[in-house]
Curated annotation (Swiss-Prot):
GO biological process, one term: chorion-containing eggshell formation
GO cellular component assignments: egg chorion
Name listed for the protein in its UniProt record: Chorion class B protein Ld10
Protein family membership: Belongs to the chorion protein family.
Length: 191
C-alpha cells in the first residue's frame, strides 16, 4: 500500500512540474536582458531600444514598449520551434500559411498577413497588389513589424509635415532621428 502511495505522490509531482513549467525567454538575464543588456541602457549604436534607440527615441524609457518590456519576452509563447512539415526537397524552416480555397469572380483582399519570403499561386490568375518583407534581428528573435498610425493628427496625411503617422517632417527631408513617430521606433509605442 505504501508503494502505491509513493508512486501516486511521485506521479503527481511529475504532472505538476510538467503543467507549471514554461520557457520565459531564449536569453538569460545575465546575457542580454539586464538593465545594461540589449534592450536596456547599453547596446550597439548607443542605447538601443531604451532611452535612445539606434536612430531616435526608441520604444520607451529603458525597455521596449514602455517600462516593463515586451510581453513576448515574458510570456510562455517563446519556446521551441513550431514543427512544420513539407514535401519539398528543401527542409522547412518556418511557419507556412496555405489556402486550398477556390476563388471565382472578383476578389478584393485587404489587410496584413505576415510572410517571410515567398508567396506561391498556381494556375492563371491576374493579380494586382503589393507585399513587404521586414526581418528584424539582434537578439535571435525574428519578428514581423507593422507600423500603424500615430495618435497625433497629421498635417498632410500619412507622410505628413506635422506630427503625423510617419514622423515630424517630410520623409525625404528629415534626418533619421526624426523618422517614424517622433524617433524611429516611436516615443513609447506609437505615441
Amino acid at each position: 500500500m505504501s508503494a502505491k502511495i509513493i508512486l501516486v505522490f511521485c506521479a503527481q509531482a511529475l504532472f505538476v512540474q510538467s503543467a507549471l513549467s514554461q520557457c520565459t525567454s531564449r536569453a538569460t538575464v545575465a546575457a542580454d536582458r539586464g538593465i545594461i543588456g540589449g534592450y536596456g541602457l547599453g547596446a550597439p549604436y548607443g542605447l538601443a531600444y531604451g532611452l535612445e534607440a539606434p536612430l531616435g527615441l526608441g520604444y520607451g524609457l529603458g525597455a521596449p514598449c514602455g517600462l516593463a518590456g515586451p510581453a513576448i519576452d515574458i510570456t510562455p509563447t517563446i519556446g521551441g520551434g513550431l514543427p512544420v512539415s513539407s514535401a519539398s526537397a528543401i527542409a522547412p524552416v518556418g511557419l507556412v500559411v496555405a489556402s486550398e480555397n477556390v476563388y471565382e469572380g472578383i476578389l478584393a483582399a485587404a489587410g496584413e498577413l505576415p510572410f517571410v519570403g515567398t508567396v506561391g499561386v498556381e494556375g492563371v490568375l491576374p493579380t494586382a497588389g503589393a507585399g513587404a518583407v521586414h526581418h528584424s534581428c539582434g537578439d535571435g528573435i525574428n519578428a514581423m513589424a507593422s507600423r500603424d498610425a500615430a495618435f497625433a493628427p497629421g498635417y498632410a496625411g500619412a507622410h505628413g509635415i506635422g506630427l503625423g503617422a510617419y514622423g515630424l517632417g517630410v520623409p525625404a527631408l528629415e534626418v533619421p532621428a526624426l523618422g517614424y513617430r517622433a524617433g524611429w521606433r516611436g516615443c513609447g509605442c506609437g505615441l
